[in-house]
Regions:
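A conserved mid-domain beta-alpha-beta active-site/ligand-binding segment of alpha/beta enzyme cores
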Residues: 106-143
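Phosphate-binding/catalytic loops
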Residues: 96-110
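Active-site beta-strand->loop->alpha-helix modules in alpha/beta enzyme cores, enriched
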Residues: 1-86, 94, 100, 144-154, ...
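Short, solvent-exposed loop/turn segments enriched in Ser/Thr/Gly
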Residues: 159-160
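Residue-level signal for alpha-helical context at structural boundaries
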Residues: 77, 134-138, 156
């Protein structure tokens, strides 16, 4: 979902997160925030069009158990659409308190963790009023995941991976 300022935030963060990427294409829609379940048909049609147009190596989405209705629907549609792909469900520390123990971790170096924090804080101005949207929250979650995973650097991101093909 990206309309107005949120679309600008998405573009700015994608440019920074994906700097150096060989190719980048952003697809944004302007569905009403908080109403995704009521808009299932057009959203599912967009997912189907994306499936026909893209062949990603990995797909990142919200957790299927996310308590935010929009996030949960997007996760469900991701699994319905990209059945033969590696899907990593990411975490968001927020009001709903729905964090659990991830099943996959990616070690980060301290500079990478700080870069992520900087990009989030610099690019997502619309989220700054939220109590959970702080450098301390982001830093704490990455440190906790670093401890859980035993990452040598002490920093990691956690993901939920429901299906992983090794080899």
């Amino acid at each position: 979902n990206a309309e107005g300022a949120r679309a600008a935030e998405l573009r700015a963060s994608a440019r920074r997160f994906l700097r150096g990427a060989v190719r980048m294409r952003l697809l944004m829609r302007d569905y009403r925030d908080g109403f995704f379940p009521a808009l299932l048909t057009p959203i599912k049609e967009d997912f189907e069009a994306l499936r026909l147009d893209a062949a990603p190596d990995v797909v990142f989405t919200h957790r299927r158990a996310d308590r935010h209705q929009d996030h949960r629907l997007i996760a469900e549609l991701t699994w319905q659409t990209f059945r033969r792909h590696l899907i990593l469900e990411y975490e968001i520390a927020k009001y709903e308190g729905d964090l659990t123990t991830p099943s996959a971790y990616v070690e980060l170096q301290p500079a990478q963790a700080q870069r992520k924090i900087d990009i989030l804080l610099d690019c997502y101005h619309s989220q700054r009023s939220k109590q959970w949207f702080t450098a301390d929250t982001f830093r704490a979650l990455m440190r906790l995941r670093g401890v859980e995973s035993g990452a040598a650097s002490g920093w990691a991101e956690g993901f939920h991976a429901g299906k992983v093909l090794l080899g």
